[in-house]
């Protein structure tokens, strides 16, 4: 019923001499998300890792994205389909959204895509029912174990699982944390929870852990950040909001997603306590490199 599709994008742009010189500071990142478009949360950091640090970014997508049809009105003319019709959407939207995801990923420098195609039946806040009754939890766990074993990652990015957020986001994060916790302690990557400013900032500021899931508890050190308004280019006239906005624009089926285009935003990362305190210093160093590496 479920299938795994691994697609490898080979960039036509060679690594810069600066990136090559910093190879010992070139992290390998696995991003675990629930839907196509969730990756935009980490847009600027992914871009800096892949383009300034010479690192790599892979993405494991848990759902098929079929539930994201309600605001697809404008995309209908582009794709020649009434994507607001549930049956039409569930037939065609998963493939369309994968193409949109990979178009945005080409901008950010995402290398590999692992599609787990779990059912996306629409929005709910109950992550436990998703894990118990909707997704094939055993299958997802096995695939995440495999990716982590073969990927030799330094860091895993997840959405910070705040309570009012979509249940799929929280469920994907829980499964990612549990997968890392099953690894030998000497081989574990550091797993982080991320959230950009400008959305539910008051809730994010109070977050300690998701009720009922102590594995999601975070250290209050940090957050460790990258400001999308960081200037670069001729006369410093460019900044990394452009990267996020370009990625958002690729998700044309997600009409309300377009309203998140902006001229500011800070990507923030917290360390889950299951990593141990040593992970705080390593995360601080990695994000310092993300902030300061020449472009």
Task: Set out the residue ranges of the language-model regions.
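Metal-dependent de-N-acetylase/amidase catalytic core
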Residues: 2-3, 20-32, 129-295
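C-terminal segment of classical bacterial N-terminal signal peptides
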Residues: 11-19
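Active-site rim/loop-helix segments in enzyme catalytic domains that contact anionic ligands
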Residues: 20-151, 178
């Amino acid at each position: 019923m479920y299938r795994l599709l691994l697609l490898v994008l080979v960039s036509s742009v060679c690594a810069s001499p600066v990136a090559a010189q910093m190879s010992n500071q070139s992290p390998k990142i696995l991003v675990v998300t629930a839907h196509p478009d969730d990756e935009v949360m980490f847009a600027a950091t992914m871009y800096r890792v892949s383009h300034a640090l010479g690192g790599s970014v892979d993405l494991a997508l848990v759902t098929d994205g079929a539930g994201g049809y309600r605001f697809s009105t404008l995309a209908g003319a582009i794709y020649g389909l009434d994507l607001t019709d549930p049956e039409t959407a569930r037939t065609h939207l998963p493939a369309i959204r994968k193409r949109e995801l990979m178009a945005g990923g080409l901008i950010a420098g995402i290398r590999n895509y692992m599609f787990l195609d779990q059912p996306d039946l629409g929005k709910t806040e109950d992550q436990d029912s998703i894990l118990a009754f909707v997704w094939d939890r055993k299958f997802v766990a096995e695939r995440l174990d495999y990716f982590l074993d073969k990927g030799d990652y330094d860091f895993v990015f997840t959405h910070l699982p705040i309570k009012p957020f979509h249940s799929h986001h929280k469920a994907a994060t829980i499964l990612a944390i549990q997968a890392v916790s099953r690894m030998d302690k000497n081989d574990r990557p550091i797993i982080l929870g991320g959230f950009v400013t400008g959305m539910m900032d008051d809730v994010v500021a109070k977050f300690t852990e998701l009720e009922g899931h102590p594995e999601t508890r975070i250290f209050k050190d940090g957050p460790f950040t990258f400001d999308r308004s960081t200037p670069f280019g001729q006369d410093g006239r460019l900044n990394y909001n452009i990267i996020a906005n370009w990625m958002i624009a690729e998700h044309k089926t997600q009409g309300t997603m377009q309203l998140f285009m902006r001229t500011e935003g800070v990507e923030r990362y917290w360390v889950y306590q299951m990593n141990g305190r040593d992970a705080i210093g390593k995360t601080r160093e990695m994000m310092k490199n993300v902030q300061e590496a020449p472009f």
